[in-house]
A protein has these predicted regions:
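Short N-terminal edge-element motif at the start of the domain
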Residues: 2-46, 51-52
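Calycin-type beta-barrel ligand-binding domains and close structural analogs
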Residues: 5, 15, 19-25, 51-146
Length: 146
């Protein structure tokens, strides 16, 4: 059965935040907002910290739909994630391909899970010497609908 881009977008396009996680572990997780929406032919996202209200990342994306996966392309960086259905068939798992590097030569590792109520994201950036530049947190950010 082909993967459903309509269901993927239905699950993804919401206003999300990690308020509960930030309240439970304030020394580990900042309170972050992460919004996704479709405008015209493009998928957009923006992120900001609750304390400042200033957007620190805004991106435009496009999807390439295949029979068994969705390729989420990040237009600004040229990087992408491959989403497949999870084992339950009621959600999605997205990962950067192995050996993904950004324009600065930093190895990027991202794992995202998505279902009708939860979006989790774990990102790690590693330099050529194996030093972790980001992603030292104890687990993924866990976002819920706002």
């Amino acid at each position: 059965m082909a993967i459903s881009s309509a269901l993927f977008l239905e699950y993804l396009c919401h206003n999300w935040d990690n308020l509960k996680q930030a309240q439970q572990w304030p020394n580990e997780f900042a309170h972050v907002h992460y919004d996704w929406w479709v405008e015209g032919a493009h998928l957009h996202s923006k992120q900001w910290y609750d304390w400042s209200g200033e957007v620190y990342r805004e991106r435009t994306h496009h999807l390439d739909i295949q029979d068994n996966h969705i390729k989420l392309n990040i237009n600004e960086s040229g990087l992408h994630l491959i989403f497949t259905e999870d084992e339950t068939g009621h959600g999605f798992i997205g990962k950067t391909p192995p050996d993904t590097y950004n324009e600065k030569g930093i190895k990027i590792e991202t794992v995202i899970t998505l279902d009708c109520a939860t979006y989790t994201s774990f990102d790690k950036g590693t330099d050529k010497d194996g030093n972790i530049l980001w992603g030292k947190i104890p687990g993924p950010f866990i976002f819920k609908h706002t």
